[in-house]
């Protein structure tokens, strides 16, 4: 493994990425802990901007932490109109363009790294819509907002490793609607149902961390024998 893959940037590096609506605020974080660094970069998308969603959301940061502890470099960013990102909320259309721009930057800067996508709530919908187009190698969807105001019918479903995590006690997303929608898909993702977990995983963040780490373990090379 090359030094560039193992250490793509300083930990918690603040970034400004050029986007279609102007500047995009982002943070690139190196793998941490004892897991060997992998040639993988995961972009993690945040929840609904109009309800306070940002790249600093606790579900987003815990997901990114779990990935880094698995040896994966993470890239979080603020959609347009959030934090230092320029522009204004565009109900998913412009936000998809933002993700395209961030992915293009990631591939230009780290061409040897496989691209994964992840998202929470609104961000999971944006990431799902982009996965096939961007040729992501894996996808993590947390609290997919099935049954809310966004269209899931016209999405080109990815044929890649796909982990879906859903709290059974979600008060924002109808968990049963999520499960029913997943049942209609020709390729079933790996589904982790978390009993008693709310939308924001209150008091369940460590369980979420474990679910992410367990879910992606099979996507990564096995560690060398001692």
Residue ranges and their predicted role:
Residues 168-173, 199-200:
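Acidic catalytic loop of the alpha/beta-hydrolase fold
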Residues 118-127:
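Gly/Ala-rich beta-loop-alpha elbow adjacent to hydrolase catalytic centers
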Residues 184-200:
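Catalytic histidine neighborhood in serine/cysteine hydrolases
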Residues 33-76:
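Short, surface-exposed "cap/lid" segments of acyl-processing enzymes
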Residues 158-159, 163-166, 170:
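Short beta-strand/loop motif that positions the catalytic acidic residue
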């Amino acid at each position: 493994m090359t030094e560039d893959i193992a250490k793509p940037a300083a930990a918690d590096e603040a970034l400004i990425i050029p986007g279609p609506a102007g500047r995009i605020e982002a943070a690139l974080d190196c793998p941490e802990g004892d897991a060997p660094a992998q040639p993988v970069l995961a972009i993690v998308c945040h929840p609904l901007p109009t309800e306070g969603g940002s790249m600093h959301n606790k579900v987003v940061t815990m997901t990114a932490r779990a990935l880094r502890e698995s040896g994966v470099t993470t890239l979080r960013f603020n959609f347009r109109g959030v934090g230092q990102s320029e522009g204004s909320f565009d109900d998913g259309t412009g936000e998809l363009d933002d993700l395209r721009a961030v992915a293009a930057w990631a591939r230009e800067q780290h061409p040897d790294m496989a691209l994964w996508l992840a998202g929470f709530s609104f961000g999971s919908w944006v990431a799902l819509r982009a996965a096939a187009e961007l040729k992501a190698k894996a996808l993590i969807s947390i609290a997919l907002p099935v049954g809310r105001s966004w269209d899931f019918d016209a999405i080109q479903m990815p044929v890649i490793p796909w982990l879906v995590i859903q709290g059974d006690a979600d008060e924002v997303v109808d968990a049963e609607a999520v499960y029913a929608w997943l049942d209609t898909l020709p390729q079933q993702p790996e589904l982790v149902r978390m009993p008693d977990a709310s939308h924001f995983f209150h008091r369940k963040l460590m369980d979420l961390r474990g679910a992410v780490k367990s879910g992606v373990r099979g996507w990564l090379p096995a560690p060398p024998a001692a």
